[in-house]
Every structure is written in C-alpha cells, then in structure tokens.
A protein has these predicted regions:
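AMP-binding/adenylate-forming catalytic core of the ANL superfamily
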Residues: 23, 28-29, 51-147
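Generic structural signal for well-ordered beta-strand positions
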Residues: 9, 15, 61, 78, ...
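Short aromatic/basic micro-patch
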Residues: 20-21, 31, 77, 157, ...
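Conserved C-terminal "lid"/linker of ANL adenylate-forming enzymes
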Residues: 97-99, 137-181
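Conserved AMP-binding/adenylate-forming
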Residues: 1-60, 66-69
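Ser/Thr-glycine-rich phosphate-binding loops at phosphate-binding pockets of nucleotides
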Residues: 48, 73, 166-168
Length: 181
C-alpha cells in the first residue's frame, strides 16, 4: 500500500511475528481510551495483534491473532483460525471452534463443532446422532493427516447450539472456553 510502512516483528523460528504498520491512514488510537491506545501504538507504529509472515515474493499472509494463539508445553504454536478453516470444509460442519483444553500441565487440542443437521439428514438419513458424531470425528482425523502431528486435534465436542458471538458474529473465544474449563 502506498505511504504505509509494514514490518513483521518478534518472529519465531517459522518467520511468523506480529504485524505492525505506520502511515497517514493508520488509526491514531482508540477514542477516549488512552490505556488501550498505549498498548497498541508504540513509537508511531500500530501493533495490529495479527500474526503474519512474508513469502518469498514479499506477500504478507496473516496466520492468526496473537491473542488467540495456543502455545503448547513444548513451545509449539497453533493458530486456531488455520485449524478452523480446515475443519469447516467438512461437509457436516456448520462452524467450528478450536481451543486448548487444559490437561495436566499441557493443553489438549480440542474442537467444538456445530454440525449442520439439515445436511446430516439429507446426506446421511439412516444415521443416528452417535453415528453422525463418529462420522464427523473420522473426517476430523482425516483432516489431521494434512498437518504436522503437534497440530492434531485430539478431542471433539459436538453441539447443535450456536456459539456465543459478538454483534459482528465473531466467536467470543474466551466465553466459549469457559464452558469447558
């Protein structure tokens, strides 16, 4: 973008770091919220909270949000948005929410799935709810094979209920997590 400077800072071993931007069209701060402004504007740079990387051609890709990142005990980082994009491609999945469920001193990578009852009845009319759950779980395990082992989803919760959302229809991640911990 013309007249906008972009940098990726605090990169990990995969080159993923926080995206920061500076320019005349970048926000100057939060309206009447100096504390929040100081958290994101530093030395004239706006720290977006987006975790990004640059490819060989110089294009920038967003991997996920800093506040949503799941960090395992071994230091491996998981971006739930990446996982949700894959899970949401399963025909029976209406929407999914990936999170780290506490297990001992680590996290168990889990997914809550709202399944599409209409699709289930149309495509699999002879399956009961338990069989639908098993079918979806098998499809999640197939999806796992596309990923490094540390990103494997190891637990699934199936629901018919809508997720708790903001007015802009984003999942309230921390509210959803409270249901399980």
């Amino acid at each position: 973008m013309p007249s906008v400077d972009v940098e990726i800072v605090n990169k990990d071993e995969n080159g993923i770091g926080e995206l920061k931007v500076k320019g005349p069209n970048v926000m100057m701060g939060y309206y009447q919220n100096e504390k929040a402004t100081k958290e994101v504007i530093k030395d004239g740079w706006f720290y977006t909270g987006d975790l990004a990387y640059r490819d060989k051609e110089g294009y920038i890709f967003i991997a996920g949000r800093k506040k949503n990142m799941i960090v395992l005990k071994n230091g491996k980082k998981i971006f739930p948005e990446e996982m949700e994009d894959l899970v949401n491609q399963i025909d029976l999945v209406e929407e999914s929410f990936v999170f780290g469920m506490p297990k001992g001193d680590d996290l168990l990578l889990s997914v809550e799935i709202k399944y599409n009852e209409k699709v289930a009845k149309e495509k699999y009319p002879n399956l009961n709810e338990e069989e639908i759950k098993k079918l979806i779980w098998n499809k999640v395990k197939e999806t796992n094979k596309l990923l490094p082992k540390y990103k494997y989803i190891k637990n699934m919760i199936l629901t018919k209920e809508d997720f708790i959302k903001t007015s802009t229809q984003k999942i309230k991640r921390f509210e959803e997590i409270k249901k399980f911990i």
